[in-house]
Curated annotation (Swiss-Prot):
Its main location: cytoplasm. Probably regulates the expression of genes from the sulfate permease complex. SUPFAM superfamilies: cAMP-binding domain-like, Winged helix' DNA-binding domain. Residues 164-183 bind DNA. SMART domains: HTH_CRP (SM00419). This is Regulatory protein CysR homolog. It is found in: Cytoplasm. PROSITE patterns: HTH_CRP_1, HTH_CRP_2. It comes from Synechocystis sp. (strain ATCC 27184 / PCC 6803 / Kazusa). Keywords: Cytoplasm, DNA-binding, Sulfate transport, Transcription, Transcription regulation, Transport. GO terms for molecular function: DNA binding; DNA-binding transcription factor activity. One of its GO terms (cellular component) is cytosol.
Length: 205
């Protein structure tokens, strides 16, 4: 299970008394191993969760931000097909299933956030159903702006830098196609790049 939290405090202030759990650090690009018999909560940074199909294709499952939980619903056989990757440097705190079930605040927090996870999954499924690649890419960028964007000049600035290959994998196309479409989107004013090469998604697309 991975679910997003709004402000960071939503997911962290409710855990007073559990913040003595040690933090684990992973660098940007690292693959994070699933937490055995439990889950990770993000203290700082952003993770992406994907699943590999039997045919070797990567299916994007969503993103998780500070306060979010990752991995609670990975069954034993699913752990081999799921991949958790750090999109930024991340600090994670691990919780066992026993700790979750025995702490009312922690359990309630996980349950409350589940609806956000469901909405994100539904949005990704809807995007995957678009027939045209440009519509899938535009839909993905809009969702990224909602989930990972920060308001700024010209629109929503993505807080992480995503490669064209990562975007291509997410919508089932090629890197070359994504590069071409992003160029067209820039010409049309739908997206831009800031000084740090972060994508800025124009509002109203």
């Amino acid at each position: 299970m991975f679910v997003n939290s709004s402000p960071i405090a939503d997911g962290l202030s409710a855990l007073v008394g559990l913040d003595s759990q040690p933090l684990q650090f992973y660098e940007r690009g690292d693959v994070v191993p699933p937490k055995d018999q439990g889950c990770w909560q993000i203290y700082r940074g952003i993770l992406q969760v994907s699943q590999w199909t039997l045919g070797g294709d990567e299916v994007l499952m969503g993103w998780a931000q500070p306060g979010s939980f990752v991995g609670l619903d990975f069954s034993a056989h699913q752990r081999e097909t799921y991949q958790i990757r750090a999109l930024t440097d991340v600090y994670l705190r691990g919780y066992s299933l026993e700790m979750i079930t025995n702490n009312a605040n922690l359990c309630r927090l996980v349950l409350d956030q589940t609806l956000q996870q469901v909405r994100q999954r539904e949005a990704l499924l809807a995007i995957a159903g678009y027939k045209r690649v440009d519509e899938r890419l535009q839909g993905l960028l809009n969702l990224l702006g909602q989930e990972l964007g920060q308001p700024g000049t010209g629109g929503m600035r993505l807080s992480v830098r995503l490669t064209h290959q990562m975007l291509a994998n997410a919508i089932g196309t090629t890197r070359v196609t994504v590069t071409r479409l992003l160029g067209e989107f820039q010409t049309q004013g739908k997206v831009s790049l800031d000084g740090d090469r972060h994508l800025v998604i124009a509002l109203g697309n």
